[in-house]
């Protein structure tokens, strides 16, 4: 028996370790490398049309993680669908979608459902903190967010997940999305922050501010998962600052059925293998499965 197997919204995974959206870019070769050891792969967020994103610098490394403002740079959906036809399918593939309206999200699902028969689901980006009119701006509109979920659930057989931010009333939004039929909630995306170059006296990022990720946001994301577990029935995916198997276990014990790894991949692409092996050793030593540990912090 595989002690790490888990399921979220009908999506069965060999382990609870998912690649978070964005960190590996939009080239399928990079996604295939991660799929060998990951439980699932979430792509970079993509919209209907190609988006150039912000000019450099777009990422800054600081002592507690990363701050990025890439600006949702991505190929057009149709081009990305062609790229993904070379995906090896060693782990379930989910497409991260961003848009500005119900119609845009609907068009995106039409594109990917028709092009990729082996697709396993979608994750709605309702939380990117640095692109006007998309991401967090959509997530702040409860009625629009619910309408997007209802539209997509009415047209695709694939699971639909939503990625939320800790920077707004995530409990209220999660409940609204649950009522709309969402299959799972991922929390949290990056949180707004910035860094200033003391020599020039100017912000380092070209966009001035960006999204903070890495260990600095882990306690915040962990509390979000803990809170949501008490309030919603749909599966929760924890995301934010996970760098060790102990971090993974904390999120699982708080109530997550799976976790996403992002910034840690920046430092080591072997992070999934390392975490997987450590989790296997932990569960075997205690004669338990990952599923046995879900939510035990509430006991």
UniProtKB/Swiss-Prot annotation:
Binding site for FMN: 21, 44-45, 125, 163, 214, 240-241, 262-263
Signal peptide: none
InterPro entries: Aldolase_TIM (IPR013785), DHO_dehydrogenase (IPR050074), DHOD_1B (IPR033888), Dihydroorotate_DH_1 (IPR024920), Dihydroorotate_DH_1_2 (IPR012135), Dihydroorotate_DH_cat (IPR005720), Dihydroorotate_DH_CS (IPR001295), Dihydroorotate_DH_I (IPR049622)
GO biological process, one term: 'de novo' pyrimidine nucleobase biosynthetic process
Root EC class: oxidoreductase
Keyword flag Oxidoreductase: yes
Catalytic activity: (S)-dihydroorotate + NAD(+) = orotate + NADH + H(+)
Keywords: Cytoplasm, Flavoprotein, FMN, NAD, Oxidoreductase, Pyrimidine biosynthesis
Major localization class: cytoplasm
One Gene Ontology cellular component annotation held by this UniProt entry: cytoplasm
Metabolic or biological pathway: Pyrimidine metabolism; UMP biosynthesis via de novo pathway; orotate from (S)-dihydroorotate (NAD(+) route): step 1/1
EC number(s) recorded for this UniProt protein: 1.3.1.14
Compartment(s) of residence: Cytoplasm
NCBIfam families named in the record: PRK07259.1, pyrD_sub1_fam
PANTHER family: DIHYDROOROTATE DEHYDROGENASE (FUMARATE), DIHYDROOROTATE DEHYDROGENASE (QUINONE), MITOCHONDRIAL-RELATED
Summary of subunit composition and partner proteins: Heterotetramer of 2 PyrK and 2 PyrD type B subunits.
Record's function text: Catalyzes the conversion of dihydroorotate to orotate with NAD(+) as electron acceptor.
Family under the similarity heading: Belongs to the dihydroorotate dehydrogenase family. Type 1 subfamily.
Protein's name in the database: Dihydroorotate dehydrogenase B (NAD(+)), catalytic subunit
Species this protein is from: Archaeoglobus fulgidus (strain ATCC 49558 / DSM 4304 / JCM 9628 / NBRC 100126 / VC-16)
Source taxonomy: Archaea, Methanobacteriati, Methanobacteriota, Archaeoglobi, Archaeoglobales
């Amino acid at each position: 028996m595989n002690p790490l197997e888990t399921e979220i919204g009908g999506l069965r995974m060999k382990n609870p370790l998912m690649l978070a959206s964005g960190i590996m870019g939009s080239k399928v070769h990079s996604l295939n490398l991660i799929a060998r050891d990951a439980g699932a792969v979430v792509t970079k967020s993509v919209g209907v049309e190609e988006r150039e994103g912000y000019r450099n610098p777009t990422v800054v490394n600081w002592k507690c993680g990363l701050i990025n403002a890439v600006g949702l740079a991505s190929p057009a959906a149709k081009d990305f669908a062609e790229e993904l036809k070379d995906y090896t399918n060693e782990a379930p593939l989910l497409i991260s979608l961003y848009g500005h309206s119900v119609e845009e999200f609907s068009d995106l699902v039409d594109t990917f459902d028709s092009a990729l028969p082996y697709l396993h689901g979608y994750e709605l980006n309702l939380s990117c903190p640095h692109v006007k009119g998309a991401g967090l701006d959509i997530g702040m509109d409860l009625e629009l967010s619910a309408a997007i979920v209802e539209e997509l659930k009415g047209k695709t057989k694939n699971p639909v997940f939503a990625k939320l931010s800790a920077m707004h009333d995530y409990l209220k939004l999660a409940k609204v999305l649950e009522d709309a039929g969402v299959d799972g909630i991922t929390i949290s995306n990056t949180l707004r922050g910035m860094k200033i170059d003391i020599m020039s006296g100017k912000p380092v990022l070209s966009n001035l501010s960006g999204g903070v990720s890495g260990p600095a946001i882990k306690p915040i994301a962990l509390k979000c998962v803990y809170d949501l577990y008490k309030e919603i029935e749909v599966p929760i995916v924890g995301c934010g600052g996970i760098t060790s198997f102990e971090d993974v276990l904390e999120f699982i014990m708080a109530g997550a059925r799976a976790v996403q790894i992002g910034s840690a991949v920046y430092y080591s692409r072997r992070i999934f293998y390392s975490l997987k092996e450590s989790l296997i050793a932990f569960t075997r030593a205690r004669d338990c499965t990952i599923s046995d540990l879900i939510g035990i912090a509430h006991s």
